[in-house]
Amino acid sequence: MDMLFAKTVVLAASAVGAGTAMIAGIGPGVGQGYAAGKAVESVARQPEAKGDIISTMVLGQAVAESTGIYSLVIALILLYANPFVGLLG
């Protein structure tokens, strides 16, 4: 296999993989919006529990955001520090 063709295939597959990884950012965004909306509803129903509701919401959003950050890191690695290009020689 021609080395230029192999490198092109690896870079194209990396771009597709990075795009697919960034699709994973949709889930945390939708989940965080839903959680924030439900927290607002909960505070409206029970204002005296505002502190507990907000702290639980922030903790849940931090956990949800971690998956989006991981997908961003994977996409950046695939695009700018691709370990597979070095294996070609």
From Swiss-Prot:
One of its GO terms (molecular function) is lipid binding. GO terms for biological process: sodium ion transport. InterPro entries: ATP_synth_csu_bac/chlpt, ATP_synth_F0_csu, ATP_synth_F0_csu_DDCD_BS, ATPase_proteolipid_c-like_dom, F/V-ATP_Csub_sf. The keyword Chloroplast does not apply. CDD domains: ATP-synt_Fo_c_NaATPase. The chain crosses the membrane at residues 9-29, 68-88. One of its GO terms (cellular component) is plasma membrane. Its main location: membrane. Keywords: ATP synthesis, Cell inner membrane, Cell membrane, CF(0), Hydrogen ion transport, Ion transport, Lipid-binding, Membrane, Sodium, Sodium transport, Transmembrane, Transmembrane helix, Transport. The keyword Transport applies. The record marks E65 as: Reversibly binds sodium during transport. Residues 30-67 are cytoplasmic. Residues 1-8, 89 are periplasmic. SUPFAM superfamilies: F1F0 ATP synthase subunit C. The ATPase of I.tartaricus is of special interest because it uses sodium ions instead of protons as the physiological coupling ion. F(1)F(0) ATP synthase produces ATP from ADP in the presence of a proton or sodium gradient. F-type ATPases consist of two structural domains, F(1) containing the extramembraneous catalytic core and F(0) containing the membrane sodium channel, linked together by a central stalk and a peripheral stalk. During catalysis, ATP synthesis in the catalytic domain of F(1) is coupled via a rotary mechanism of the central stalk subunits to sodium translocation. Key component of the F(0) channel; it plays a direct role in translocation across the membrane. A homomeric c-ring of 11 subunits forms the central stalk rotor element with the F(1) delta and epsilon subunits. This is ATP synthase subunit c, sodium ion specific. The gene is atpE.
